[in-house]
């Protein structure tokens, strides 16, 4: 599983309603060969499971994704930044449920399955979170 930057969503743009209208959820893509191998069609709903979590999404089959890879667009599925109801001095603040839409890649987790304690899975070469190589399983819902 890899992630890629969105052309519309980021932490700075997640609160813009017009962008959510144009693209309400993030793209989850597979190569068409993988779709055929797993009996998946463009638009199917799938469950993606990693060592750190799972999520459901609608898939797109795209030739630009390398076979064997699940590609998820980063920048969706926010839990705050106006997505949750809060109060200030007893007054409810405005919020927008749409900001929650899509998969938050962080919720698929970067938990290291090789450790006995909760720990972030780090790339041994770069020392960064394993964001571009999470092992994942995909199945039709």
Description of each model-found segment:
Residues 1-16:
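Long, low-complexity segments enriched in small/aliphatic residues
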Residues 13-29, 33-141:
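Long, contiguous, secondary-structure-rich segments that constitute the structural scaffold
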